[in-house]
Amino acid sequence: MVKLNSNPSEKGAKPPSVEDGFQTVPLITPLEVNHLQLPAPEKVIVKTRTEYQPEQKNKGKFRVPKIAEFTVTILVSLALAFLACIVFLVVYKAFTYDHSCPEGFVYKHKRCIPASLDAYYSSQDPSSRSRFYTVISHYSVAKQSTARAIGPWLSAAAVIHEPKPPKTQGH
């Protein structure tokens, strides 16, 4: 153990006392200022940034970027184009997803069609396809006009049995 409050310069002056049980060993040797710091130089050279740049012979001409910069730019633009295509594909599939139709209807040509109409026109000849689409368009027009003609405050029978005024030809 080391005895506290002992002076390291008096190391050899006193013999270690046996009765204390401590040894007087200096923990830190004294430091001299001359050893801590190198002498300051008389001339200091400060290197600036312009010393490291090569002389530019073509100051007025356009400097062509490196090929590596073009490669990175092309890769980034291709990645963005790919991601844009993926987003458009997902949005397209979301809008054209096969919708479910009520019971008794079949989904054809982006519409829910009654299964009986589909079975009737699919069993006929191929030229009946045009008639099939005509029936479907009339069906949807009739459905729209019926929904507009009948208000919630009128009964359906009153609207159907009302006499219509005769149409006059002319202006």
From Swiss-Prot:
Keyword Transmembrane among record annotations = yes
Which of UniProt's keywords are assigned here?
Cell projection, Cytoplasmic vesicle, Endosome, Golgi apparatus, Lysosome, Membrane, Signal-anchor, Transmembrane, Transmembrane helix
Spans through the membrane? 72-92
The UniProt entry's GO CC annotations, sorted and at most eight, read: cytoplasmic vesicle membrane; dendrite; early endosome; early endosome membrane; endosome; Golgi cis cisterna membrane; late endosome; lysosomal lumen
Instruction: Drop me one GO molecular function for this one.
Output: clathrin light chain binding
- UniProt keyword Transmembrane, yes or no: yes
Major location, coarse class?
membrane
Check the record and name the PANTHER family matching this protein.
NEURONAL VESICLE TRAFFICKING-ASSOCIATED PROTEIN 2 (PTHR28546:SF2), NEURONAL VESICLE TRAFFICKING-ASSOCIATED PROTEIN 2-RELATED (PTHR28546)
Family as reported in the entry's similarity comment: Belongs to the NSG family.
Per its record, how is this protein called by name?
A: Neuronal vesicle trafficking-associated protein 2
Source species: Bos taurus
